[in-house]
């Protein structure tokens, strides 16, 4: 099995705009790159991941990721799901039979949690890691890589579940702290500042 991870990152000039009331543009840029570094470090340490593709329309992000061992893929347009489809196609071209999608704003993600998500995959199907509110999807493992279409954004967890059901695909759901906690709002920043990173939980459920 060949598992390739795809990490999408938008332009630094527009990233984390919901934090604009709390952070200046330079501070948001620093935060985005710091979170990305942590995610790439975890992916590089994961035993189940063979390669990492970083998709972005921002040349600075691509250069930053390439220095950390990622395959840098320029996204001609904009849009999270457009970038993920581009990354998926590149992963297929490189021989992937399993696609791992991981968002770039997970400050507590660990290599063990990444491995657990891939290990949760059935022979053919999907494994989802929702955010802590069960609204969004922070990571997804797909076998084959085009098992479902990426539908990330607000409410994506329900959309991905619905796709799996409509296609008759087995679905597993993994809820662990490092995959569930993302940085979107000032409240998230406050929680991050008030808590030290913790190790992976073993909680797992499947449907």
UniProtKB/Swiss-Prot annotation:
Gene3D superfamilies assigned to the protein according to its UniProt record, in alphabetical order: Spore Coat Polysaccharide Biosynthesis Protein SpsA, Chain A
UniProt cross-references to Pfam families, sorted A to Z: CofC (PF01983)
Record pathway: Cofactor biosynthesis; coenzyme F420 biosynthesis
Keyword Lipid biosynthesis: no
Residues noted as binding phosphoenolpyruvate in the record, renumbered to the chain: 137, 153, 156
Catalytic activity as recorded in UniProt: phosphoenolpyruvate + GTP + H(+) = enolpyruvoyl-2-diphospho-5'-guanosine + diphosphate
Region forming the signal peptide: none
Enzyme class, broadest EC rank: transferase
GO molecular function, one term: phospholactate guanylyltransferase activity
Keywords: GTP-binding, Nucleotide-binding, Nucleotidyltransferase, Transferase
Reported function: Guanylyltransferase that catalyzes the activation of phosphoenolpyruvate (PEP) as enolpyruvoyl-2-diphospho-5'-guanosine, via the condensation of PEP with GTP. It is involved in the biosynthesis of coenzyme F420, a hydride carrier cofactor.
PANTHER family hit by this protein: 2-PHOSPHO-L-LACTATE GUANYLYLTRANSFERASE (PTHR40392:SF1)
Further remarks about this protein from its record: The exact nature of the substrate is currently not known. This entry has been annotated based on its similarity to Actinobacteria.
Family per similarity comment: Belongs to the CofC family.
Protein name, per record: Phosphoenolpyruvate guanylyltransferase
């Amino acid at each position: 099995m060949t598992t390739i991870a795809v990490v999408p990152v938008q332009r630094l000039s527009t990233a984390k705009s919901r934090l604009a009331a709390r952070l200046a543009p330079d501070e948001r840029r620093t935060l985005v790159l710091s979170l990305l570094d942590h995610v790439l470090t975890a992916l590089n340490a994961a035993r189940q991941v063979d390669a990492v593709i970083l998709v972005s329309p921002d040349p600075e992000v691509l250069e930053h990721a390439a220095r950390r061992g990622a395959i840098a893929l320029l996204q001609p347009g904009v849009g999270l799901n457009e970038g993920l489809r581009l990354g998926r196609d590149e992963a297929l071209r490189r021989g992937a039979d399993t696609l791992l999608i991981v968002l770039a704003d997970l400050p507590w993600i660990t290599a063990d949690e990444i491995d657990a998500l891939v290990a949760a995959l059935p022979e053919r199907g999907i494994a989802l890691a929702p955010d802590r509110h069960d609204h969004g999807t922070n990571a997804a493992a797909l076998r084959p890589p085009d098992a479902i279409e990426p539908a990330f954004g607000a409410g994506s967890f329900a959309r991905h579940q619905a796709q799996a059901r409509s296609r008759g695909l087995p679905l597993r759901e993994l809820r662990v702290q490092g995959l569930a906690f993302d940085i979107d709002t000032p409240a998230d920043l406050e929680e991050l500042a008030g808590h030290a990173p913790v190790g992976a939980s073993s909680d797992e459920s499947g449907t």
